Structure formats: C-alpha cells, structure tokens
Amino acid sequence: MEEREGTNINNIPTSFGLKQHETPLPPPGYPPRSENPNLFPVGQSSTSSAAAAVKPSENVAPPFSLTMPVENSSSELKKKRGRPRKYNPDGSLAVTLSPMPISSSVPLTSEFGSRKRGRGRGRGRGRGRGRGQGQGSREPNNNNNDNNWLKNPQMFEFNNNTPTSGGGGPAEIVSPSFTPHVLTVNAGEDVTMKIMTFSQQGSRAICILSANGPISNVTLRQSMTSGGTLTYEGHFEILSLTGSFIPSESGGTRSRAGGMSVSLAGQDGRVFGGGLAGLFIAAGPVQVMVGSFIAGQEESQQQQQQIKKQRRERLGIPTTTQASNISFGGSAEDPKARYGLNKPVVIQPPPVSAPPVSFSHEPSTNTVHGYYANNTANHIKDLFSSLPGEDREEDEDDLEGEDDEEFGGHSESDTEVPS
C-alpha cells in the first residue's frame, strides 16, 4: 500500500509539463535524504552513488532544482470522477459544496458552481451533450411529484353543490319529461282540492309520490256501507298518499282522469285507509311531493312536432307552409309544359285532295300509291329545308300544280273539299 502511494506521488505532473521524481521518505531513525538528487546518475555502486550525492564531482553539470509545493500522501484521498450530486440520498438539497480542484495550479475557491458550467443546453438553446446547469437527478423530483397529490387540498373535498329543490317550486336541475314539485297545505285547507288545482295549471300529467302531516277530517270510499263512503273525524297522521291525474279529451272537452288513495294512523295506533272520496282536511301543515310529467302519447306527438320544427328551421322553411306546385315553365295540368315543351313541334300533314265526283277514268291502285309516296317525299324535303320562308311556298305551289295535272281538276275545287 505504501509503495502504491509512493509511486503516485512520484508521478505528480508539474505546471511545466515535467514529472517530479521524489524518492520515498526514509523510515524513522535514518537521516533525511537530499532534496536535490543528481539528475544524471551514473551506474555505480551504492557507496559511490551516496558519495556522489553528498559531494558531486566537478565534471558533472550543476544540479537543477525546482521549488514547488508537494502534497503529503496522508492528504491524498481517492477522488470520485464526475459532477457532484445536487441532492443527498435522502432527497434533501446539498447546500454546501466543497469539491477539490483537479490540479494544484487551479486556485482553491469556495464558489464552485460559478466557475463550473454545464455542457448541456438550457431552454431555447442549441444542442448539448447533457443536462443544463441546475438540473439535478430525476429521482427526487419523481418522489416529490408522487407526493404532491397528498398536499392538494382539493383532492379530499367532496362536491357539495348538489341541486336541491326549493320550498314550493321545482328542482334546479330536472329532466324535461319529469319535474318534482313540493306542495304545502296549511291547516284547515283541503289537500285534495290543492292537488287538483295544481294539476289544472298545465297540460302535463301529475303523480303523487308521498305526503306527511296531520289530518282532521277524511272521507274514504267504502263499498260495504250505505252510500259507499265513510267519514272519519279526529287526529290522524298520514302514512302514505299516492295517486295520479292524467289529462284526457273526449268529445272536445278536456278533463282529468285519476284518483288518490291514503293510509292513516289513529292515536291508538290502528291503521286504516282507502280511496279518497271527499274531504281531506289538514289539521296542520301538510307537505305533498308531486311529480309532473308528459304522457306517453302526448310526449311522442310533441317530440314529432319539435323534430319537424327543427327540420323546418334548418331548411329555412316558415312554420306555416302551403303546398306549392313546382312548375317548369307551364301549368301543372300540361305534362309537356313541365319539361319545357311550351312550343310543341307540329308536323302538318300534306294537303289531301279528294278526286272529283265525276271523272272520265278510274284511278288504279298503282297511281294512288305513287301519289302518296310522292307527297310524303316532298313533305319530308320540306321539313328539312334550310330556308323555311320562300322555299316552302314554292314547294307548296309545285305540289298543288302536280295534283291538278294528275287528277285533271282545278285548284279552287281542290281547296273546297275538306281534308
């Protein structure tokens, strides 16, 4: 171990690029050796070399010595390569940084971070080989990020902004098809009339979900008694109240169809109930939970109307539209006018002149056939003529002349015969 330390000390580079050769320290009890050994030793015996070290000869060049600080082997410690850690193993920030300089020529200063500059790139800079200055290891950051959610006070807060219904109105957030309501009936008022009045305010159907409160007078439907009803007077508590009223239309008149049933408890604990058939007087404040909704058939009709209305608004069609006939340049009765055939092409048949009543010879079938063939050919030529003005008149004159010559008649007699 001492030999390794000695070799390390001997090979310390100087600021002049030379290596300082120093002999190992002598053991205790021996005289110290000279610090200026002979730079040019000669291969002699140990005694001659020692004498030459004490008294150099005249032929040898004068000695060359360097005076520079030499570090003790005891202060020599094993240095760790790389940049020092910014964080301790426990995750705390290492504030005191005291790195050792690389060489003895570098001045020893306490501000190590100011002279050392990271080779990495910062934000907005070019490429670099490593992380920028001031960036530490990622492990403590990951631990801090993992524990940040514990420090967030909103993480353990519950949402207390739940919608609550008011004292006598609908809830704040409700569905359009079902809306809850709370009705309050004061003492001495009829609960049944209160519910019926509420149901007639709109076109929606209602259902009674529950009720609570004291009752002083109630009339129930009893089929076993005379008259079919039975009235109870006293102090009773409402256990349950259910029922529904759905709008109906018959013969052009709209009405409400439905009913309610109640269960009551007397002061002695006996329970009775039945369908309400009359008075239902409250002895104190009574709260009734009612829900309004749209009936199935009415809901489907309203949805269809709403869908149609939305489609009309998208297309830009007014709400009250009448059926309009789309015409293509003509009336709806004329099918040709729909396709723009306002001026139909009419092919006029050739003038057919009947033979006179009295003539000297009988026409043969060959002459009649040749007559129609000639007239048809001339008529087709007339249709495809380039000048329909003068040429058509000349062709008609020629046809009339040929007809007169063939049948031997006059033009006046030919025009008098209907075609």
Swiss-Prot record:
Annotated segments matching region Disordered: 1-168, 301-337, 382-419
GO biological process, one term: xylem development
Subcellular location: Nucleus
Gene3D superfamilies the record matches: Hypothetical protein, similar to alpha- acetolactate decarboxylase, domain 2 (3.30.1330.80)
SUPFAM superfamilies xrefs: AF0104/ALDC/Ptd012-like
Alphabetized PROSITE patterns for the sequence: PPC
Entry note about domains: The PPC domain mediates interactions between AHL proteins.
GO cellular component, one term: nucleus
Motif Bipartite nuclear localization signal boundaries: 78-86
Functional note: Transcription factor that specifically binds AT-rich DNA sequences related to the nuclear matrix attachment regions (MARs). Acts redundantly with AHL3 to regulate the formation of tissue boundary between the xylem and procambium in the root meristem. Cell-to-cell movement of AHL4 from the procambium to the xylem is critical for its function in root vascular patterning.
Protein name: AT-hook motif nuclear-localized protein 4
